[in-house]
Amino acid sequence: MRVIDAHTHIFPDKIADKATIATAEYFDMPEPPNHHGKVQELLDVLAEAGIEYAMVFSAATSEHQVEHINRYIFKEAQAHPQFIPCGTMHADYAANQDFKAELAWMRQNGLHGLKIHPEFQHFVLDDERMFPVYEEMEKNDMFLISHTGDPRVNVSGPERMYRVATAFPRLRCIATHLGNWGDWDMGKIRPITELPNIYVDISSSFSYVEDKGPLMDILHAYDPKHIFFGSDYPIWCPKKELEKTLRLGIEPGLLEDILFHNFAAFYHYRAL
């Protein structure tokens, strides 16, 4: 069985512990993370779990971090072919810097998507300063992956993802955490499940709830070819998240697609 982890974070060793702890505290983890967000640790965990590839990223919390993070991710992906690199962007960078040049650099260096995390970046997912970025991405077959949902603040909910995805219908958008982290309400999520350019990952979802039934209903509401496995490393352990996914009772053909084939087809920039 082949597996791609479509949702992992990595950090330079000197800040990895601090970044991981801050993230875990923000999201009220039901159990403390056992990992630290360091490159070698992720490589070791992937090997132990039998996971072939991991998409890696880190969100820029200021405009000044954008280029540094993108080059860091590029460097680590060059060194480790197991890594699928994904860049980042910030609304302040989009407003003040030459974002088109940065997106071109990303594409030329194998970073075909960008990750945003509005809660930590202090702008909303549908911030109109980001619309020129989304337009440029749409023109150049880049994809967006965004943290989606937080019941405590309204900066990345499914209604904001819906606005972006409908404004840019050829921009492929990955809504993380089944589309609305911490508020898995079908009524709120259903509108994005009906959009052809919406994809979703299952990271940081099933591990937060005892009753898996409502989340399984949400999973089955999405296009079955648009669902990806993701662990949210280092918040969760890829090996344990894979084991939990295998125990959900997902139909074998769909399970194989979620674990590997769907993302392999989505990520057409290189053979996986």
Language model features with spans:
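Active-site environment of divalent metal-dependent phosphoester hydrolases
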Residues: 11-14, 61-64, 92-95, 121, ...
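Conserved, mostly hydrophobic/aromatic
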Residues: 7, 46, 73, 106, ...
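Mid-to-C-terminal alpha-helical segments outside catalytic/metal-binding sites
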Residues: 1-9, 13-53, 223-226, 235-272
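Well-formed, non-transmembrane alpha-helical positions, independent of function
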Residues: 45-48, 105, 163, 191, ...
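Catalytic pocket-lining loop regions of alpha/beta-barrel enzymes
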Residues: 112-113, 123-228
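Active-site gating/metal-coordination segments in enzymes
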Residues: 52-53, 61-145, 150-151, 194, ...
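Alpha-helical scaffolding within the catalytic cores
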Residues: 37-42, 67-74, 97-101, 157-161, ...
